[in-house]
Every structure is written in C-alpha cells, then in structure tokens.
Amino acid sequence: MKLTTNDLFASQPLFHCPCSSSSRPRRRRFYGLHFPINLTSEKNNSLSIVALSDSDLPSRTAFSRRAFLLAPPLLVSAASLFLKPSVSLASEESSSATVTSPAESAAPPPPPATTTPSPPPPVNKEETITSRIYDATAIGEPMAMGKDKKKVWEKLLNARVVYLGEAEQVPTKDDKELELEIVRNLRKRCVESERQISVALEAFPLDLQDQLNQYMDKRMDGETLKSYVTHWPAQRWQEYEPLLSYCRDNSVRLIACGTPLKVLRTVQAEGIRGLSKSERKLYTPPAGSGFISGFSSFSRRSTFDMSLPTQIVPFGPSSYLSAQARVVEDHTMSQVILQAVADGGGTGLLLVVTGASHVEYGSRGTGLPARISRKFPKKNQVVVLLDPERQFLRREGETPVADFLWYSAARPCSRNCFDRAEIARVMNAAGRRRDALPPDIQNGLDLGLVSPEVLQNLFDLEQYPLISELTQRFQGFRERLLADPKFLNRLAIEEAISITTTLIAQYEKRKENFFEEIDYVITDTVRGSVVDFFTVWLPAPTLSFLSYADETTGPDSIDALRGLLGSIPDNAFQKSLAGREWNLNLRIASVIVGGLKLAGVGVVSSFAAVGASNALNIARKVIKPELVVAEKPKRSPLLKTAMVYGGFLGTSANLRYQIIAGLIEHRLSDELSSQPLLVNAISFVVRTLNSYFGTQQWIDLARSTGLQTQKSIPASKEISEALEEPTVECDTTTEEESIDKLNNQ
C-alpha cells in the first residue's frame, strides 16, 4: 500500500511527547527525509541529526520520489527549527503554548545597554531646626512634625503671604527668636529660587516707613531709629534688634504696617467719628464691608466652649470703642499688605509679623486673612501661631485656628512635643518595647519630652554590653551619655592625661627609689584619678527626666530642694532642652552649685589622701624600721589642707572645667560634628593645657597659704621628706617636687 503525505505525518506527529518518564532524550523524526532531529532537553539544548540505519527502511528506491517531492517543505520546517533560539525550544519542552514566528526568532537578542551611572546630585545640608512645629489642620490633637521639615518649608514657600502671629497677652522674647529663625531660612530658600522676600511689622506705624528706609540704606543707625519708637516697652527694642539687623545686612525689605499712634489713640478715645474725613477714608473700611472685628469668632468653636463663663464678656462703651479700634487696625494693615504684594510682583514672598488675634482662623475668621481673601486667593495665605498658650483639639467640621503652631525649643510643653510616629519607627527598628526601657525614659516618652534622636542614641550605645549594663543600672551615667555621646571619650582623655603626667612626675622625683616607694606612687595616682573623674563628671551636661519621673513623696523642704536642684543645669553653658528654659540666674546658680560639689570632692579626697599616706607611713616603719629617722618631718595640717584644696577645686578648677565641658566640648563639638577627629584633638590639647596650668595655680596657692615651705632643705633630709610628707597637690604635682625645684634654683 502506497503511503500518502497525510498518512506519513499522521503516523508520527511532529510534537509528539511520550507520557513515560524516560530519561532518554526525546526524538522528533521526519521520516520523509530519513534525518530525524533529536531535540534534547539537556542543559545546552543542542540539536543533533541522527542517521537511520538501513534496517529501519524497507528499501531505498521505494521512496526516492517521495523524498524529492517532500524535500522543499521539509527543508523550510527544518530551517525554522534550526533558527529557533534555545530558550524557545526549552519553553516548548516545558509545555508552554507560546508560538514564536521565524522572523522574530531569527532576530538576535539586543545587546545589553551600558549606562554610565550619573553622579548623585549634591545634597544640601538642611539647617538644624531645634524648634517644634505642629500641624494645626489635623483632626484631633495637633500633629507634631518630624525632624524632616521639608513639607513645612514647601507650604510656606508656595504662599504669597505668611502671617506670624505673636503672643499678645503675655509677650515673650522667644517669639522674636522664632521670627528670626523663620526669616533666615525663608530668605535662604528665596535666594536659591530668585524670589524677593519682605517683612511687614505691625510694631512700626506706617508713618515711620521713611525712617525704616533710611535704616535699611544704612543712613540711620539703630540708636536713631530707636528714638522714634519711644512708646515701646523698654525690652522690646532689644528683642527686635536682631531681626532688624539681619534684614538690613541681608537686604530683606522692611515694611511698616501698623496704624499711626495718633489715629489709633483717637479711635480708642472717641471712636471713628473722632477722625477727620481724610483719615476715615484712609484708615476705616467702606460701609457695608461686612466685618465686625474685635471679637473672637466663637462660631469656630463648639457650643460648649461658647457657654463657658470665661468666654462671656460684657459689652459696654469701652468694648465698643475697642472694637472700632480693631477694625481700624485690621483695615490699615490689610491695605498695606495688598500694596506690598502688588509691589513684590507675581513671585514675591511677604512675611507679616503681627498679633495672633489678627490672624486666627485664617480666611474664615475676621482678621487680616479674611479681609485680604476677597482680593487674594485663599490658598496663597499661611497662618503660623508662635508659642500659643493652648492647643485645642480640632473636631470634624471646625475651622483650624492656624496652619501651623510653632514653638520655641525652650518653651515648656505638656504633650506631643515630638513626632510620635517617628519614635514608634525607632522603637520598632531597634526591636525594643516601651515597658523594657528605664522608668524615667518611659515617662519622658509619655510626656513627649524624649526626641527620636535621643532615643536612637540610647539604642546605639546599648549595643555595647558594658555600656548597656551601665546605662541600665546608673541613671547619672545614662543622663550624661544622652546629652553627650562622647562623654566616655572626654573621661578617657582626662584620665589618660592624669595618670601619665602623675607617673612621669613621680618617676622624675623618686628616680631609683620609684619601685621601692611604689605604695606612695599608687596612692598619689589613685587620688589624682578619682579627683579628675569628678572634675569631668560633675560639670558634664546632662539630659535628665528625673524631675518628671520621680513621683516619690517626702517632706516639703526636701521636695523644694529637689525641685530647685532639678531646675538648675549641670553646666552653665548647656543648651536649653525641650520644655526647659534656663535664664542667666539659673546658669549662675549652676556654677555655684557645681563649685560646692567639687569643693566637697576636694575635702573628702584630701582627708582620704592624708589618711592613706599616714597609714602607709606606719606600715613602712613596721616593715622597714631602718627607714625611721630621729627627727620627725614637718607635716601639712590636715584640716587646713582639706579646706584649701576644696576651695581650689570649687573655684579655679570648677570654672575651668565648666568652660571646657560646656563651651569647647558641648557647643563647639556640635558645630564640628562632621569632624570627630578634630574635636577629639582639640579636647586633648585643651585638657592637657588645663592640667598644666591648673598644677601651676595649685603650687602658687599652696605656697601662699603656707602648705608648702619655700626654705632650703638639707640633702640628708631629702629622703625622709620624700618618704613621709603626704601629698596635697592637684593631679600630678607633689609637695616634694616643689621642694626639689626650689633646691635646684
């Protein structure tokens, strides 16, 4: 029976896959050509052509004609299989239904693109912002902004007018510091974006604009400008002077937007009707403007708040005149602001420094933003309240009192001082639980007094087993490490200097008797190390939450003393912490208290050193009686030595270590935080010089008070003096060393 083409291909399918799990390679045969193509599924996916033996076919001549007829189509099929990439064949072997066209299969894979990595863009180092910022538009409690203040600056820069509302009932200098901080940062960003920035001040009446222009052009000094604001309180000029000087030195335009005093006093005394016709046209809103200013917008709060007795204010003649004065103030400032915005072009930024009551509730209130919003888009105005006394919980549907609440770092806070979400992230990253932290840290977190940075520093330090054990057991050690993570470096530098210089001085003095008198050497070295430890420990800055966590009860006098000591910083130059403000009196008290502590250390160490010397002398006489001499050497008086040495540590040493720990190692190290090697080198040099000059001061003091004699001593008595006289000097100098110096002279 003659086979047809259909019978040939139907008898053995092209993609026939046997179901048996044989390890042999599967073959796909094209019987018409007698060249079966073996498609193996091995790693190389190679294609091989296996020749059939003669026994596989009945005869060669029977199908020569069929071979000739089937050759062209089968050659095309074979070529397509050869041109298929190995990846497509492997996918077919794994029963994928994807069919690739020959043209697509023949296309070579594209070469891998070689992209040169572009250099990373320069990262602008953001200025450290120590103040606290809250988003007042959040529902519920105002939300603390994290350490990343980019969103705040972006919103301020996107506005055309930024209102800075100062405290009016109880003015504070912290507001002026915040204003300078905000102006400085905004001015830096406006210079980068080539925008003009101006500052409008309500404190300056608009009739003083010429004087402000002369001050900006440096044709008038500060004292002359001060003579035009004699109506200010005495301290207000000192508070405004840094802001005025910065604006003048950095070409930030100053605008006077306050109501002239004559007009304001006339309205307060007689009302608007007391103004002339021309003054009414300039300083009063047109009839039918719809604003009745001077009263709080109670509709922004709940009915419960409106019913409080403290909110009810009787309306009398004086209140009516005050309301009219408020209308005049708001209208005058709004006109100046609109003109300043127009003068600034389409991209200028205007900062308005005014009272908080003039800007509360923004465009939905009754103050400046509401008046300007009629001629100005609402989204181009941002309201910032500086150091507000209260934080309201915003309910759904209520108008926020402002866009941001901005607190100075020194202002006390009762809740949510730091971003709690950031604190939770730090806790989760470290795998720590709040109940496993020390009690003072837990209460500090509950009150919002522990920043995420401080918490991260604590976790980093606890990675070392020894430091972790010390921080968990000793609160004083933990407080100093939190305030200064390099506290151990300072302590190690001081101890290394003390021990090294003491041993060198002892060896130079005793020379060949150094090891024979090793007991005296050890006594002096240990005493100097203990004293140096406390001179580093006591003046060191601390970050303490003990006053918040300590809930123990005791006598009133003890509580009062504990509260007094808790309010005093450990170092006079320590930076103000969140919720604490240390004035000049408290910093002076810090020096006094620190001096008393070091004086106590000096008295105790003197008693201990003299007692140890006497005990060693007695033991030496018992062990080596041949060292006993007939003449008893002169000894320094015990009580006098202790009092003089305590006074020396409480005055000279206290002041020197306050400066080193506060100014050099606390404030200067923060400025040079990016160069730790330089900071450590400066600390080492300063402490070495301090040890040297401190020793010289103690020698002069000991001689002037009679603790050390200056007369010549015979050489025969030199050994007995060196063996028996107790040491009373600071750190490295002994009494015997000073005597030898005199003998050499």
UniProtKB/Swiss-Prot annotation:
Comp. bias intervals (Pro residues): 107-123
Effect of loss of the gene: No visible phenotype under normal growth conditions.
Keywords, in A-Z order: Chloroplast, Developmental protein, Membrane, Plastid, Transit peptide, Transmembrane, Transmembrane helix
SS bonds (residue pairs): none
Protein localization: Plastid, Chloroplast membrane
Name by which UniProt lists this protein: Protein RETICULATA-RELATED 6, chloroplastic
Domain of life: Eukaryota
UniProt biased composition (Acidic residues): 721-738
Gene3D superfamilies: 3.40.50.11550
Residues that span the membrane, as ranges: 529-549, 591-611
Topological type in the membrane: Multi-pass membrane protein
Region ranges (Disordered): 94-126, 718-745
GO CC terms, sorted: chloroplast; chloroplast membrane
Naturally occurring in which organism (per UniProt): Arabidopsis thaliana
UniProt key word Transmembrane: yes
Pfam families referenced in this protein's UniProt entry, alphabetically: Cofac_haem_bdg, RETICULATA-like
